Amino acid sequence: VHYHDCFVR
C-alpha cells in the first residue's frame, strides 16, 4: 500500500 500515492493523486 502506497500511502504516498494517495497524496500524489
UniProtKB/Swiss-Prot annotation:
UniProt cofactor(s): heme b; Ca(2+)
Main location as per UniProt: secreted
Signal sequence extent: none
Keyword flag Calcium: yes
Entry keyword annotation includes Secreted: yes
Catalytic activity: 2 a phenolic donor + H2O2 = 2 a phenolic radical donor + 2 H2O
GO molecular function, one term: lactoperoxidase activity
Transmembrane segments: none
Enzymatic class: oxidoreductase
EC nos: 1.11.1.7
GO terms for cellular component: extracellular region
Alphabetized UniProt keyword annotations: Calcium, Heme, Hydrogen peroxide, Iron, Metal-binding, Oxidoreductase, Peroxidase, Secreted
Location of this chain's protein in the cell: Secreted
Cofactor note: Binds 1 heme b (iron(II)-protoporphyrin IX) group per subunit. Binds 2 calcium ions per subunit.
GO BP terms in the entry: hydrogen peroxide catabolic process
Family recorded in the similarity comment: Belongs to the peroxidase family. Classical plant (class III) peroxidase subfamily.
Function: Removal of H(2)O(2), oxidation of toxic reductants, biosynthesis and degradation of lignin, suberization, auxin catabolism, response to environmental stresses such as wounding, pathogen attack and oxidative stress. These functions might be dependent on each isozyme/isoform in each plant tissue.
Name recorded for this polypeptide: Peroxidase 4
Native organism: Solanum lycopersicum
